[in-house]
From Swiss-Prot:
Residues 13-60 are annotated as: N-terminal extension. Zn(2+) binds at residues 31, 34, 58, 117. Residues 60-89, 115-143 form the 4Fe-4S ferredoxin-type domain. [4Fe-4S] cluster binds at residues 79, 124, 127, 130. It comes from Thermoplasma acidophilum (strain ATCC 25905 / DSM 1728 / JCM 9062 / NBRC 15155 / AMRC-C165). This is Zinc-containing ferredoxin. Binds 1 [3Fe-4S] cluster. Gene3D superfamilies: 3.30.70.20. The gene is zfx. One of its GO terms (molecular function) is electron transfer activity. Keywords: 3Fe-4S, 4Fe-4S, Electron transport, Iron, Iron-sulfur, Metal-binding, Repeat, Transport, Zinc. [3Fe-4S] cluster binds at residues 69, 75, 134. It comes from the Archaea. Ferredoxins are iron-sulfur proteins that transfer electrons in a wide variety of metabolic reactions.
Amino acid sequence: MVKLEELDFKPKPIDEHFLENDKDYPVTGQHNGHDVRAEGMQRLDADGKPYPTKLGIHGTHVAVDWDCCIADGACMDVCPVNLYEWNLNPGKSGTGNDHKIQKGSEEWNKYRTDKCDPVRESDCIFCMACESVCPVRAIKITP
């Protein structure tokens, strides 16, 4: 798990209106059966500095801002339907992800941390547990 103090950026909560803002959050691709928005686009962190990644927002009804996500894993622990997996560790979930990313590696430069992937987005029961537990508010549930 990554500590906020160790980051070289300041996470900003997911834009609650991203679905209504096609200009800033256009659908740029698909990943594991869900839409990806703003991938490859430079966005700013809470300090107004460019995020070190350009990974975008993954999902629609269960959306995770991958530029903000710090791989805490709490969302996975509280989800009653297990809709999340680690992107770099398919099939794995929960805190303390198994796949450690070394600083300076190719994966580090691309992702910075593993990412919480809403691979079973359609299974969501809209309990909002993941949204409420995320320490950086990277998740937005839209029923």
